[in-house]
C-alpha cells in the first residue's frame, strides 16, 4: 500500500487512515479529542474536511468540492405564508368536567326502520304494525279442580304390548302386521334363538325340510334308534376308548383276539394273572 493513498487525521497528525475508513475514524477520534473538536469546523461541501473556524471562509472559497449555488431572492425571503382559515367544529362534550351520573343517554333509533312483514300478510299490509303478540299477555291459570276434571275426561292410554315393540311412528304401516303362513308353518319372531324350544313345542324359527308339517315333526326333533353293529367273529363290539386288557361284561374283551385267546389265563406271556374287575 502506498503512502499517498492514506489520509491524515485532522485531530491527530500521527493517524494515517485509508479513505474507506476515514469517516468512521473521524467520529471515533472526535470523541477522544474533544479539545481539538471545539477549534475545528466542518466544511459544508465535504464532511471529511475539518479546518479551523478562522479559516473556514478561505477554505470554502478554494474547496475543490465547491458547487454553484443559486442565491436566495429577496422576494422569496420576505414572502408570507398564507394561514389556513379552517376552524374545527364546536364540540358539545366537555372532557374537563366529570360525567353526570344523573343524566341518561337516549336510546339509538334508526329513522328508516320498518317492522318486519308477517308471513300471512300481503306486501300492501307489510308496513302495518303487528299487534298479534303483546308483552302484557299472560296465560290464564286454570284452577286445580278444572285440571283434575280434564284429566278424568281424557281416555286412558292403551297398555303397551309386545306386538308394538317394533313400531315406527314415521311409517304409515301398522305395527308388526300379521305375516302370512307359508306351506302351513307358523312364522316365528325375528329375535328368537333357533336352538331354544319355543312355546308350542317348536324348536327353531326356520321351517323344517323334507316335507314335515310342523317343527315337532322335523328330523332334528326325532330320536333315531342306534343301528346295530355287525358282529365280527362273533364278538360283541365295545367302546373305542375301553381298556383292551380289562375283561368286559359278557366275557369279551375290547381288543380282538385273532389267535383264539379267550382270557388272560390262556395268554402265555403273562407269568401272573392280574386282578380283573368283574
Swiss-Prot record:
Keywords: Cytoplasm, Developmental protein, Metal-binding, Repeat, Zinc, Zinc-finger. InterPro entries: TRM13/UPF0224_CHHC_Znf_dom, UPF0224_FAM112_RNA_Proc, Znf_C2H2_sf. PROSITE patterns: ZF_CHHC_U11_48K. Zn(2+) 2 binds at residues 43, 49, 59, 63. GO terms for cellular component: cytoplasm. Its main location: cytoplasm. Zn(2+) 1 binds at residues 9, 15, 25, 29. It is found in: Cytoplasm. A zinc finger (CHHC U11-48K-type) spans 6-33, 40-67. Residues 149-230, 249-278 are annotated as: Disordered. It holds the Pfam family zf-U11-48K. Residues 165-175, 214-225 have a biased composition (Basic and acidic residues). Residues 149-164, 188-200 have a biased composition (Polar residues). GO terms for molecular function: zinc ion binding. Belongs to the UPF0224 (FAM112) family. Involved in oocyte maturation. It is possible that D7 is required at a certain point in the maturation process and that maturation cannot proceed beyond this point unless a threshold amount of D7 protein is provided. This is Protein D7. The gene is d7.
Amino acid at each position: 500500500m502506498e503512502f499517498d493513498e492514506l489520509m491524515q487525521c485532522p485531530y491527530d497528525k500521527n493517524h494515517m487512515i485509508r479513505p474507506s475508513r476515514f469517516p468512521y475514524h473521524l467520529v471515533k477520534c472526535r470523541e477522544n479529542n474533544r479539545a481539538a473538536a471545539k477549534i475545528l469546523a466542518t466544511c459544508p461541501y465535504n464532511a471529511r474536511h475539518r479546518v479551523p473556524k478562522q479559516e473556514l471562509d478561505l477554505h470554502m472559497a478554494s474547496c475543490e468540492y465547491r458547487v454553484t449555488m443559486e442565491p436566495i431572492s429577496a422576494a422569496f425571503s420576505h414572502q408570507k405564508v398564507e394561514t389556513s382559515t379552517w376552524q374545527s367544529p364546536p364540540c358539545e362534550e366537555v372532557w374537563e368536567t366529570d360525567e353526570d351520573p344523573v343524566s341518561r343517554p337516549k336510546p339509538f333509533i334508526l329513522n328508516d326502520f320498518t317492522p318486519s312483514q308477517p308471513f300471512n300478510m300481503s306486501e300492501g299490509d307489510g308496513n302495518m304494525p303487528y299487534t298479534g303478540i303483546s308483552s302484557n299477555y299472560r296465560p290464564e291459570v286454570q284452577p286445580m279442580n278444572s285440571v283434575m276434571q280434564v284429566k278424568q275426561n281424557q281416555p286412558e292410554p292403551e297398555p303397551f304390548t309386545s306386538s308394538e315393540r317394533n313400531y315406527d311412528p314415521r311409517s304409515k304401516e301398522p305395527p308388526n302386521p300379521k305375516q302370512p303362513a307359508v306351506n302351513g308353518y307358523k312364522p316365528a319372531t325375528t329375535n328368537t334363538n333357533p336352538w331354544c324350544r319355543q312355546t308350542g313345542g317348536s324348536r327353531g324359527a326356520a321351517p323344517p325340510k323334507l316335507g314335515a308339517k310342523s317343527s315337532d315333526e322335523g328330523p332334528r326333533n326325532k330320536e333315531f334308534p342306534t343301528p346295530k353293529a355287525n358282529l365280527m367273529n362273533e364278538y360283541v363290539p365295545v367302546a373305542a376308548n375301553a381298556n383292551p386288557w380289562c375283561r368286559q361284561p359278557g366275557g369279551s374283551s375290547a381288543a380282538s383276539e385273532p389267535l383264539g385267546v379267550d382270557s388272560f389265563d390262556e395268554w402265555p406271556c403273562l407269568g401272573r394273572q392280574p386282578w380283573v374287575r368283574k
